[in-house]
């Protein structure tokens, strides 16, 4: 037997609803909240989740004194069942949002088996559009200003894939610098060389040598050599895309080259 309409749910049951809904689904969250054969409807679980409000992250009680801060910024596709009410999505391609995630940390520790971010703090949500992006970054930089001694802080490194919204953040603080993350750099270099078979490693080495030597012109030449021996149009497009990506993010790559 299910709960009657408008029946009250205890705080303990609400907690179990939210825990299970985060891990699996609305339906299982409703089942997990009850004892015996009773269950809370998935619509009730959904309503509980949708009414949640998350306060802004409180600044640290005492300002910390560090010379460098690191920010990792990324986004992901999330599929929606609907936007505001069931049935309002008519086309499959419009049922996704791209929430943004930012985490601020002071360093990375390694204990021999895993890496751990030092004093990590998280920000994120569906901050859509230009104004949403600025609002999110303002929250991040307000937290930094209130939590860290600005006289000691020298640089803020923002790691990401080079998306416009990430670059916006790098332009909103005088001490912020955009850094292209290594994953995306390696991905594009591999994409540009994978078809070269036995020569692939040599071509990659030439690109990495140009990067480590801080020679942009040499990196451009390396990509042009690959294009010269690439016959298939589809692969040529991949090489051209990688070339534009690496050269277009050159300043961000150089921030991590010592």
Protein language model features and the residues they cover:
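Catalytic center-proximal scaffold of phosphoryl-transfer enzymes
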Residues: 1-258
